[in-house]
Regions:
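Conserved small-residue
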Residues: 218-266, 348, 696, 713-815, ...
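Acidic/polar loop-and-plug regions of large Gram-negative outer-membrane beta-barrel proteins
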Residues: 262, 339, 344-416, 615
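Extracytoplasmic gating/loop element in the C-terminal half of outer-membrane beta-barrel translocons
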Residues: 260, 270, 457, 564, ...
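Glycine-rich, aromatic-lined ligand/substrate-binding cores of catalytic
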Residues: 814-849
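Extracellular/periplasmic, surface-exposed regions of secreted and cell-surface proteins
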Residues: 160, 175, 256, 277-280, ...
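Short, small/polar-rich motifs associated with maturation and membrane association
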Residues: 1-327, 331-333, 337-339, 418, ...
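Short, solvent-exposed loop/turn motifs
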Residues: 23, 35, 64-67, 169-170, ...
Length: 989
């Protein structure tokens, strides 16, 4: 007993900050080798009982961890970790200390990026950066995520961000090679990149070997499966469909057309089209260095079988880089990358429709002589009769896509290579010159084949199409950098010049009439031939200068002049200036005697960027040779000249504040406004010109919003660590100018969005649904005049009509969300870790085009319909007077137009998604070191586990880009996203 008392001592003490001698709050104090611990109170004090001669471990974020012998009375001083304080953020052409940034930049490190196994960086960022909306338009393997930074500022030109990889614009990379990703969101940071940065910049820094480091090998492998998610999309089963059809037929006709034996057939066509798709990723990387050389090399394989049968992708990529000191004044960086990929698509768009539209009464397989199903898919032609037993084929689409998929295919193959040579010349310790030279080439081939043994109304004799594309690019960037410090004054500047040339070639050929199973073009009768050859060039010059005083006041100015061959000679040069300033308040003397705010910075920026992301040479009149005149090839005009085309221009303003409380809670708030002017639009012209439209600069759009981010280290003691982060971005989009101030429509597959001054760029324009008349079950629409105003009765109430053609369209919602964001958390204890990522979107409207045929009130009697019995929306069908129903009465061959384009099918697209959960274990160093390992991690990860949404389709996360065949927010037989389960292991030697 006395020995035990003698073995313990009571320890009291205070922990101080070495920089300002202030007590430190919340310092974690652990008895080394045990789980005993405590934290300091608000005055920096602690008290605990520990074994005599115990060693205390003190840790605090941003400070060096220290070990100290325990005594009864202790005064402990902790020093800041210079490496953390001087954390450098890569901006592509330059690097800036994080504390000294004057721009809106968010950096995410590899640890928070690689919890999602994906070949696409967009998925890695989803829900992790405020103001950045990442959308997966579907589940087709190989499709890239769509990224929007601070809204959409262009209608016809691309609004996607540009990637800068290791200082090279447009570089390629493998996600497993990523070290950090920085998202540049305002003109202060993006202005140096000019036109390419109109949609923002994503700066990727890849892993590299360090000079003087030992050789290490990293191995990573993940494997698992993916299942299709159908969300709230529920189709009728055999019984519900049978009873639904009973309401569409007269009793005598129903018995003849729909025999009771159909109730014995209940085929789930979706199960025939979809399966569990395998997904796997393997990566090996080697890095190391000698005194003057650092090297890194990796090889990666990614394979994914699509959940839709017959689809998938395979990709192999390699990366190698060398950093070498050639002389004291010269060093060199060399990097090469290659990617080889192959993608298989659904051989027909009809497959996604047929998976749900086919009647459950139709069996997809051939029946044998005994009436039993075989494993062979049945062939159906235009006669809509089964060849095996001559029963009717009830489905309206008189073909069997499962049979066709046995013979037909659509696929693409590509190979990309890039090389970078960079030389850094150090004239003095304050003056440096860098030249970066890049070369890249890419080859792609796409093939589409329809076998004559399958039924296709367009090509009963078979069809083959092949297209090939080749691209080559060369670029050089040359930058002179200098900087120095005189007392409290620091000055840095750089001046640079870029030049790039590129060439792209494309050829295509199609033919018909080949023999069965022969998919060679030379076995066909020529059907069409096409192609193009497009060269291009650009140059730019830029200047940037920055100044700070006392590490408290910072200002940066940038100017870039850029020329592009996309525009006519007199409009080729664009001028893009920008400026940014910040005040690091926490470095002021009056902030040194307080304990709560450990970092506080105000920042502001304003600048101009451009956009030239349109097809080349739109300013020229073009001719086509695809037409005949008197049976001879003739050149006919295909496009009007538009010689005054010029750059789209974006004026960007941003204000921000960065705060850190008690060195555990980081927070940022940003306000921004971006005015995009001189938008490139297709403007109507007089029919007498022989054309309907011409491309001109004729519009403006404004985006304004607020972004908020908070990251907190909630717990860091006793081997426990808990971090949590939340971010949200609110954006308002408004069209501020249209050609001649006249609104116009963007239309795809009969659905329209109106572009009008004062409205969102993606404003849905259609007739407004008013519900169902409870007295007779008729569909109702609100009465609207030609100007989009409601027609009111004498009492001032909205009036309705059951005549679809008696009313007009109006704006009924937008495809743009009000806000989006994410919540992410990481918990770890004693090697065990759990990472959880979520993302959310609110306030957008989705037009569910699929419902026009699958929720059609009798208009499509030979299509299966969406279930009302199993719907999660509480849908009901009108049956008798007095029913307050969501669906009108069903009528055979419905002519009420209840399924025509209207806001009936415009749905709330808001959702909250459990994006990813990763659970794993890091083996202790003491254990794995015996096997010469420096790291051994095992983990299990699951993606898309749950989604809360009211949307009746398969997934509310859909396309946010408008084009010739689609609109932002338009849902139409989309490839469903998948839920993925994978296991993985990472080992380092």
């Amino acid at each position: 007993m006395s020995m035990a008392i003698y073995a313990d001592i009571s320890v009291k003490g205070t922990v101080y900050d070495a920089d300002n001698s202030e007590p430190m709050i919340g310092v974690s104090i652990l008895v080394k080798g045990t789980t005993m611990g405590t934290i300091t109170d608000f005055d920096g004090n602690f008290e605990m009982t520990v074994p005599d001669k115990a060693t205390l471990q003190l840790s605090y974020m941003g400070y060096k961890t220290i070990e100290i012998r325990a005594v009864e009375n202790m005064q402990i001083i902790m020093e800041t970790d210079a490496q953390q304080l001087q954390e450098v953020v890569s901006l592509g052409y330059s690097a800036v200390k994080k504390a000294e940034l004057s721009s809106a930049v968010v950096t995410v490190d590899a640890e928070k990026l690689t919890d999602v196994t994906t070949p696409d960086v967009g998925n890695m960022l989803q829900g992790k950066v405020a103001g950045v909306q990442v959308t997966n338009a579907g589940g087709q393997p190989g499709d890239a995520a769509q990224i929007r930074i601070r809204g959409t500022g262009s209608i016809t030109a691309s609004a996607a961000p540009v990637y800068v990889v290791d200082g090279v614009m447009g570089g390629t990379f493998n996600p497993n090679d990523v070290e950090t990703i920085s998202v540049l969101k305002d003109a202060g940071s993006t202005g140096i990149y000019g036109a390419a940065a109109a949609g923002g910049v994503i700066v990727v820094t890849t892993k590299s070997g360090k000079k003087g480091s030992k050789v290490s090998v990293d191995l990573k492998g993940t494997a698992g499966g993916k299942q299709a998610l159908f969300g709230n999309y529920r189709m009728m089963d055999s019984k519900e469909l049978y009873e639904y059809h009973r309401t569409l037929f007269k009793p005598t006709t129903f018995i003849a057309e729909r025999p009771a034996s159909l109730l014995q057939q209940d085929w789930n066509w979706a199960k025939e089209f979809f399966h569990i798709g395998a997904i796997q990723n393997y990566n090996v990387a080697v890095k190391g260095g000698s005194e003057h050389v650092g090297y890194y090399a990796s090889l990666d394989y990614f394979g994914e079988d699509g959940t839709l049968k017959g689809t998938g992708m395979k990709k192999v990529s390699g990366h190698a880089s060398i950093k070498a000191d050639i002389a004291k004044w010269l060093d060199m960086n060399v990097k090469v990358d290659f990617t080889k990929s192959s993608i298989e698509y659904a051989p027909s768009w009809m497959m996604l429709d047929d998976a749900f539209n086919k009647m459950p009464w139709d069996c997809p397989y051939v029946y044998d002589a005994n009436g039993k199903t075989t494993k062979e898919y049945v062939y159906i032609d235009e006669h809509r009769e089964r060849p095996d037993n001559h029963d009717p084929w009830y489905s309206g689409s008189y073909w069997n896509s499962l049979h066709s998929a046995e013979y037909n295919y659509a696929k693409s193959n590509s190979f990309d290579f890039s090389g970078v040579l960079q030389l850094n010349v150090h004239f003095t310790d304050w003056l440096h010159f860098t030249t970066t030279n890049t070369f890249s080439t890419g080859y792609s081939k796409s093939s589409e084949y329809t076998d004559r043994r399958t039924f296709d109304a367009s090509f009963k004799k078979g069809y083959k199409n092949e297209s090939n594309g080749i691209s080559k690019t060369f670029g050089t960037t040359n930058i002179l950098k200098g900087g120095n410090q005189w007392g409290a004054h620091s000055f840095n500047a750089m001046i640079g010049f870029e030049y790039g040339i590129w060439k792209s070639e494309y050829t295509s050929a199609a033919g018909t009439g080949m023999p069965n199973g022969i998919d060679a073009l030379n076995a066909t009768v020529p059907y069409s031939v096409g192609g193009y050859h497009v060269p291009g060039a650009s140059w730019s010059a830029f200047l940037q200068a920055s100044y700070d005083y006392g590490k408290r006041y910072f200002i940066t100015g940038t100017y870039r002049a850029e020329a592009s061959s996309i525009f006519a000679p007199k409009h080729r040069v664009g001028h893009f200036p920008s400026a940014a300033a910040s005040w690091l308040i926490s470095n002021e003397q009056f902030m040194q005697n307080q304990k709560v705010v450990s970092f506080l910075k105000l920042r502001a920026s304003y600048g101009v960027t451009g956009n030239n992301n349109i097809p080349a040479y739109q300013y020229l009149a073009t001719y086509t040779l695809n037409n005949l005149y008197q049976n001879n090839v003739a050149a006919t005009s295909s496009r009007l000249a538009s010689p005054d085309l010029k750059w789209e221009t974006a004026y960007m303003a941003s204000l921000g504040i960065d705060l850190t409380f008690i060195k555990r809670i980081d927070m940022s708030i940003d306000l921004y406004q971006t005015d995009n002017t001189d938008l490139l639009l297709d403007v109507p012209v007089a029919p007498s010109t022989g054309f309907f439209k011409v491309t001109k600069n004729a519009g403006s759009v404004r985006n304004r919003g607020i972004e908020f981010r908070i990251d907190a280290n909630v717990i860091d003691m006793n081997k426990w660590r808990w971090d949590i982060g939340f971010n949200i971005g609110l954006n308002q989009n408004r069209v501020t100018k249209t050609p001649d101030h006249i609104p116009f429509l963007q239309t795809a597959i009969d659905v329209s969005q109106q572009v009008k001054e004062g409205q969102d760029i993606y404003s849905w324009y259609m007739k407004e649904w008013a519900g169902v008349n409870p007295d007779n079950g008729d569909p109702l629409w609100y009465m609207v005049d030609e100007d989009g105003n409601y027609i009111l009765d004498a009492a001032g109430n909205k009036t309705t009509t059951n005549d679809y053609n008696a009313t007009h369209a109006r704006v009924v919602g937008t495809a743009s969300p009000k806000f989006s964001g994410g919540i992410n958390t990481q918990v770890s204890w004693n090697g065990i870790f759990v990472h959880i990522n979520t993302n959310f979107v609110y306030g957008n409207k989705i037009y569910n085009k699929t419902r026009e045929t699958t929720d059609a009130d009798g208009a499509y009697m030979d299509y299966n319909q969406m279930s009302l019995v199993h719907s999660k929306q509480g849908w009901t069908r009108w049956e008798k007077p007095g029913d307050n129903a969501t669906h009108p009465k069903a009528i055979s061959a419905n002519e009420s137009h209840s399924n025509a384009v209207s806001s009936r099918y415009l749905e709330d697209g808001s959702f909250f998604r459990l994006r990813n959960i990763t659970v794993g274990y890091d083996f202790p160093t003491k254990l794995i070191s015996k096997a010469k390992m420096t790291k051994c991690r095992i983990y299990f990860t699951a993606d898309n586990l749950a989604t809360a949404t009211k949307f009746s389709g398969m997934d509310p996360e859909i396309n946010m880009v408008s084009g010739s065949n689609t609109l932002a927010g338009l849902y139409n037989s989309n490839y469903p996203v998948g839920r993925t389960f994978q296991g993985g292991v990472e080992i380092s030697f």
